[in-house]
Each structure stands twice: as structure tokens, then as C-alpha cells.
Amino acid sequence: MGISLEFRRKLFHILGGLLWLVPLFYLQKSLLLIFSLFVLALNLVFVLRLAEDKIKPIYKLIYLFEREKNLEKPAIQALWLNLGVFLSFLFFTKECATVGIVLTAVGDGFAGLIGYHFGRIRIGQKSLEGFFAFFVSSSLALWPFVGAFALLIAFVGAVVEILPKNIDDNFLLPLVGSALACII
């Protein structure tokens, strides 16, 4: 039995999200913004399928992580995440953006993993178990950065993640987490 699509997706979400911490800590702000714009442009090429016939191996890799409903616009959720991360870099301090990235990568990743595999109590298209997984995992991951405020940020993040909305939570969560970190 192979690894489920949802497990692959969420593992990629967690690791890919946390990977943003490397340029955040090692590049000057101007280089960070240029790098982020490059990533967004590349991501947009994938979503719009502008080079699919030229880089088929990359698309085959992308399709390993993509849900059936997103095959027309592959990597669209990654684009939303990368846009939210870019705006966090642009508008918030490095420390605040770190909180937004960790909240999104860890909280949303574990909410999806637990909710998909163990979720029984449904709240719309999400689950109560996923909500608690978001809260617990992001509280633990954020504690070294913000101490007890991790509980508040994790709770607000879990609420944002579970509520039905027209805006992708991969876009909202980095901004919400970054803003909360700067406020407290």
C-alpha cells in the first residue's frame, strides 16, 4: 500500500512551508522580496500551465501532490501560500513573518493530516479533530517564538482554518499569524 495523496500533500505543505524560513533568515529583505517574487512567478507558470509541454517531468512531480479538483490549475494552493508568505515578508518584521509561516505550515498541515485520516465530527468540509490538531501542533511549534501567546495565535489560526470562506486559508493564515505576532 502506497502513501496516500493527502499524506504526501500535507507532508509537502509542512516541509515546503517551513523551507521559507531559510531565505527569511539568510537573505537581506530586498533579496528576500526578489527571491519571493521569483518563486511567485514560477508558481504562476505552473498554475497557468504555460510551460507544461516543455517541462513535463516537473508537472509529473506536481501531479503527485495535487488533488483531482485542482488538476486544471496545478499548484494553485501553493500559489496562495506563497502569496501570503510574500505579503508577510513585505508588511511584517522577520520575527512576525516567522510566526505566520510556522502557524500555516505546521497548523494547517497537521489539521489536514489528522482531519483527513481521523476526522469524524464534521464542521462543514473540515473536522473537529483537525481543528484540535491545528491548535495543539501550532501551539507547540510557536511556543519557542512567542511563549504562552502561542495558545492565542494557534486558537485564532484554527478558527480561521475551520471557518468556511471564499479566500484560501493558505493565503490568510500567514497574514493572520504575522499580524497577531506583531500585535502581541
Regions found by a protein language model. Name each.
Residues 1-184:
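Hydrophobic alpha-helical transmembrane segments
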